[in-house]
Amino acid sequence: DSAVASAASRMVSAAKDRPCMDMGGRRTNEWAAVAAARAAVIGGFQGTANLLAAQLYGLKAIGTAAHCFTLVHDDERSAFASQVEALGRNTTLLVDTYNVEEAVKTAVEVAGPQLGGVRIDSGDLAAMAQRVRNQLDALGATNTKITVTNDLDEYALAALQSAPVDSYGVG
């Protein structure tokens, strides 16, 4: 637990004023994920996608949909519509399951310019975040937040400081 809390603390320091959130439950067994989520929050993360850890330890539950959520729908539009219907426009939509540019366009069409956020989980995160920010702004979604995920550590977070990223999902 102390190794996870220490790593989380280093990531929070590298992230500066951008929040870090635990999304590591997909990478380890169930009970290790619960312990790691608690340790990450002790290290400064602002919440966890692990609902059991949130319940057991009174942590803030956060999260977005996974790629499998999009894949079980007929298309991205229906996946986004389902998520927005269930969680409201302030939700964060995962936009890199297929084609990022098309997904961002669809996300704003479905949720409107009040869309809470988008998540990018693959590719060159800095370059992709810049392209997505430009596209969101052009579509009128100027307040939509960008979260990036995918094998992040303190070095990756430091390298992303100049990118238009609002938060990090780690794990």
Give the location of each predicted region.
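Buried, small/hydrophobic-residue-enriched core segments of structured protein domains
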Residues: D1-N143, L152-A159, A163-P164
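Glycine-rich phosphate-binding active-site loops on the catalytic face of alpha/beta enzymes
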Residues: D166-G171
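Short hydrophobic "strand-cap" motifs at the C-terminus of beta-strands
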Residues: T149
